[in-house]
């Protein structure tokens, strides 16, 4: 179950011919209410795609009726014409739903710099609306894939309500948000203000800490829609926990499907002076090509970890840093620790723990190894 697990939502994914080979490439997620509270977070890349620019305006009043998504083209760096294409897409879906275009979020993913084939896209929107149903969540999740090899879906049951979600992303995964489109839905009764606060809290500790290749997309969008169809006003603490779990579940799936990856790496930074320091250190390690290559080669090279830590302005004393790789403390006090031969890097899941010995704050950042397959895939992405 996916975005249609909560009551009040319909979805569909169809093949409109934007991508080759008859693959699904247009999706809609429709909120049939009775409420339409919503919030969204977007890329912090200053080069924002046209659908991001449109959707930032659309979600500003906290009311969203539907989301339309396409894969096969990012509609980024396409100028005023690209923005008009995003507007036209919103207007087209709004007309089909007898609603207003300023209540439609538009998302696109794919190659940057090319206009979308609008006749195909609009025909796809019509087909998706016609097919939209309570069991359409899986097809919708399939339609937003680009280099993803599998669809990503998740849901959780709360006390009288449900939270569902879908996401896409396999490359350009880096804060803010990681390269992703994600639609989250709930049938809980929430205000727009609650949606905003809860979504930001969840993404801050999940999507924002997924960093596979240091490349921030132009199109990142995560939107939360609340239909209120369950009639349940949730306990905020419980809802926040479950929403974070859904986002974390999707993050794990994104990490598992990252382009060319053979290892899923959790970088746990503890003993930091602040959470910001912990995140900064985690990101520095996650983006260090030498470290990522070492993990690919199953080499527990803790020196590369320390070298990455040293590039940050986090508070620490080099002689107080400890590093463990898969539970073996290979570095103690900034120098040689336990026998690195004890480290088993055969499993796909790898945990690197860095103790800065500078405080009590902590954070985890997720990344992958750097592989030959990643280079091959991204050297031929547009050809």
Swiss-Prot record:
Write out the catalytic residues in the record. 179
Give the UniProt record's GO annotations in the biological process aspect.
Answer: L-arginine biosynthetic process; ornithine biosynthetic process
| Pathway(s) the chain acts in | Amino-acid biosynthesis; L-arginine biosynthesis; L-ornithine and N-acetyl-L-glutamate from L-glutamate and N(2)-acetyl-L-ornithine (cyclic): step 1/1; Amino-acid biosynthesis; L-arginine biosynthesis; N(2)-acetyl-L-ornithine from L-glutamate: step 1/4
Q: Which UniProt keywords apply?
A: Acyltransferase, Amino-acid biosynthesis, Arginine biosynthesis, Autocatalytic cleavage, Cytoplasm, Multifunctional enzyme, Transferase
EC number annotated for this UniProt entry: 2.3.1.35, 2.3.1.1
Site (Cleavage): residue numbering on this chain: 178-179
Q: Which NCBIfam families match?
A: ArgJ, PRK05388.1
What is its biological role? Catalyzes two activities which are involved in the cyclic version of arginine biosynthesis: the synthesis of N-acetylglutamate from glutamate and acetyl-CoA as the acetyl donor, and of ornithine by transacetylation between N(2)-acetylornithine and glutamate.
- Please report the name of this protein according to its UniProt entry: Arginine biosynthesis bifunctional protein ArgJ
